[in-house]
């Protein structure tokens, strides 16, 4: 096993750990989930570049008769990238005392002001940061509003 294979295993393990945390552990942290809303995906250009580069590496490894283990590891990395970038849906998860947005826990008392833009983006101003929440279904903004009013 080469250093390349070890690095690939490390990256695959990191992506797998992130996927498991995002899918199974995060919804169970900090109490029961009150509301989970699907968000719009960000630009997919980065993901296309990543998966495309891994596909080029697979092609290069196969045509130069590289190690079969490396080909399998590159394929696993491409599949993990495909899952994380295209199959997994980003979500905002509301709990009793706060919410998870982009895998970061934010307590409700940190929200200084909220606005709704004309194009349906909920803007939450924190102490030093502004969150732009783009929901997939515009009707979910009303659910978020009701939940925040109940918990404030």
Curated annotation (Swiss-Prot):
Instruction: From the Swiss-Prot or TrEMBL record, state where the protein is found.
Output: Cell inner membrane
Q: Which regions span the lipid bilayer?
A: 6-26, 45-65, 67-87
Which keywords does this chain's UniProt record carry?
Cell inner membrane, Cell membrane, Membrane, Transmembrane, Transmembrane helix
Q: Does the keyword Membrane apply?
A: yes
Q: Name one GO cellular component term.
A: plasma membrane
Topological relation to the membrane, as annotated: Multi-pass membrane protein
Family, according to the entry, reads as follows: Belongs to the UPF0266 family.
Q: What is this protein called?
A: UPF0266 membrane protein YobD
């Amino acid at each position: 096993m080469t250093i390349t294979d070890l690095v690939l295993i490390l990256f695959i393990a990191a992506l797998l750990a992130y996927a498991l945390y995002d899918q199974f552990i995060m919804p169970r942290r900090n109490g029961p989930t009150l509301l989970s809303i699907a968000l719009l995906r960000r630009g997919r250009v980065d993901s296309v570049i990543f998966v495309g580069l891994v596909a080029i590496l697979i092609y290069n490894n196969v045509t130069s008769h590289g190690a079969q283990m490396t080909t399998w590891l590159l394929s696993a990395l491409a599949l993990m990238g495909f899952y994380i970038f295209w199959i997994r849906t980003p979500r905002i998860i509301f709990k009793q005392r706060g919410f998870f947005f982009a895998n970061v826990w934010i307590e409700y008392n940190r929200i200084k002001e909220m606005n709704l833009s004309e194009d349906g983006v909920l803007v939450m101003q924190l102490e030093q940061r502004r969150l732009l929440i783009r929901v997939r279904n515009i009707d979910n903004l009303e659910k978020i509003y009701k939940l925040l009013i109940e918990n404030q």
